[in-house]
Structure formats: structure tokens, C-alpha cells
Regions:
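A compositional/structural signature for long, glycine/proline-rich flexible linkers
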Residues: 1-192
Length: 192
């Protein structure tokens, strides 16, 4: 009887720990195979057959369709370069250049992965429509109120996620350092 109770207790503890670890990995995001460059994080293996089981479960849970590894990579930013969460009531500037890519998109989502409604019905920019400086760099202001130049409205969302998708790019699994890949800076400028 004592052996049976010990086995039952061990099984219960193992189940709770396993389910708890899985829940944590799915809700908090895991860094298995992640590339982190400044405020940007990408998981280049999500579009491959060798994706880790936690990422596979997160993809199934979110219902997203990841970019195939031969097509490109998606970088996500939920905070600025200093680690402050992106707030839709604040002005945030993305400045600099992107890694080499045939085409890129920058899109604004809420924390549930839905596009944020706003008065302009603009949720992002592409590499074809962004206004650039003479040196090829750009500055995009993500803010609740209209700004001149490249303005991406937040629609008053409290928190949001920026997604930079690079198509036909050499950035991938072998990329490890920010000196290898120039990513736009994410800077919190002003908050009410």
C-alpha cells in the first residue's frame, strides 16, 4: 500500500510539474533557438520540420502560420531597447535600417495577435512604401496621435507587438550577434 501511495504521489508531482512547465512555456514564450538582437526576437526554426515541441505547441495554440525557413524570418518586439513594454499611449520611434532582404513588412498587433483597428486603417508599412532618408535609413513613429512622415497609429491600444518580417533574407539560424545584422532601434520617446 505504501508503494502504491508513493507511486501515486510521484505521478501526481510529475504531472503537475510537466503541465506547469508546458503552460509556462506556451504563455510566457520560450527562448529555445531564438535570435535576440536589441528589442527584436526571432525563432527561425519555427518554419522548419525541426521546430522544438514547445514552439510547435505555441503555433498550434495561436493558430499562426509561420514563415517557411526558405522564405524569410519574423522578428517580434514587445519592449523597447531598454526593456520597457511597448505602450500604445506612448510615442515610440523605430529608426535605422533593416537586414538585407528582398522585401520586408512591419506590422502592429495586439497581444492576442489581432491587427489593431485605427482611424487610418493602417496596421503597418512595407519596404516599398516607407519614406527613407538619403542614407537609406528610415524612422517610423508608432504613436496614438498623428505625426508627420512615417506614422503608424496605435489606435489607443494599451500594449502591442511589432512584427518585422524579412522575406528572402540571409538572416536565419546561423545569425547570432547584432553586429552581423543591423536591426532598427526601438526607442520610447514620450509617454503621457
Amino acid at each position: 500500500m505504501r508503494l502504491l501511495l508513493g507511486l501515486l504521489f510521484s505521478f501526481t508531482v510529475a504531472t503537475v510539474v510537466g503541465l506547469g512547465a508546458t503552460w509556462f512555456a506556451l504563455t510566457q514564450g520560450t527562448a529555445f533557438g531564438a535570435i535576440a538582437i536589441g528589442a527584436w526576437t526571432a525563432w527561425p526554426k519555427t518554419g522548419t520540420a525541426s521546430v522544438d515541441p514547445y514552439a510547435r505547441a505555441a503555433i498550434a495554440r495561436n493558430g499562426e502560420l509561420p514563415i517557411g525557413s526558405g522564405d524569410g524570418v519574423a522578428f517580434f518586439a514587445v519592449e523597447d531597447d531598454r526593456g520597457r513594454l511597448l505602450d500604445g499611449r506612448c510615442d515610440v520611434t523605430l529608426a535605422g535600417t533593416t537586414p538585407q532582404a528582398r522585401f520586408w513588412t512591419l506590422t502592429l498587433y495586439d497581444l492576442e495577435g489581432q491587427m489593431i483597428a485605427n482611424s487610418l486603417d493602417r496596421q503597418g508599412f512595407t519596404s516599398q512604401e516607407v519614406v527613407r532618408n538619403a542614407d537609406g535609413s528610415f524612422a517610423i513613429v508608432v504613436a496614438p496621435r498623428a505625426r508627420s512622415g512615417n506614422w503608424l497609429p496605435t489606435g489607443g491600444a494599451e500594449r502591442y507587438v511589432l512584427v518585422l518580417r524579412l522575406y528572402d533574407t540571409p538572416v536565419g539560424v546561423a545569425t547570432r550577434a547584432s553586429r552581423e545584422v543591423p536591426m532598427p532601434s526601438v526607442t520610447l520617446e514620450r509617454c503621457p
